[in-house]
Amino acid sequence: MPLMNRNIENFIESLLFASGRPLRLSEIRTILENEGIRVDLAEVKVGLNNLEERYADTSLELSEVATGFRLQIKKDFSHLLSSLWTENNKLSKSLMETISIIAYKQPVTRGEIEEIRGVQVSTNIIRNLLERDWIKISGYRETPGRPALFITTKTFLNDLNIKKISDLPPLPEKEDLSQDEITDTTEINLEAS
């Protein structure tokens, strides 16, 4: 590998490591060019591919999510990191049900969520989802009261390590669900993100 290509790869790696958020191809190119490093998008892609190969036998991986590329710990190693975080990342069953309904039925109103869940949606759940930046208001339904329409955000996709909402697993058919299966799927491990 030519020295310049290896340097570009190292520059890209350092940007991804230090950014604290996913970076788009165009952002990487712009940052490098602002530092006097002439590079086109194809070279950035080659650098990312080389990084992906370099990490194949390590605990790190290059991941493409909804808002760009990021470095992260592979899932196989995430259990080792749980003691580093004091924040409890477990989500309540009601929060999980609410975000699931929004993800699969978006755009959806609070009333529609309540109709599907069969119980009232707590203001704290909606606030929690908004504070996590997992949902946002996309508009208002043209009905009496003009209820807010909720959709998921790119942050939600990033935290689930997916690029687009269609990457979510399909919903099982209604008759295929037993109550035990519904209860067993109410936890997401966010520590690897």
Task: Label each residue range with its predicted role.
Residues I12, L16-F17, R21, N88-V108, ...:
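Short amphipathic alpha-helical interface segments
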Residues R38-N50, R117-E131, P144-P147, S178:
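Short amphipathic alpha-helical interaction segments
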Residues L51, Y55, L129, F156:
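DNA major-groove recognition helices of helix-turn-helix
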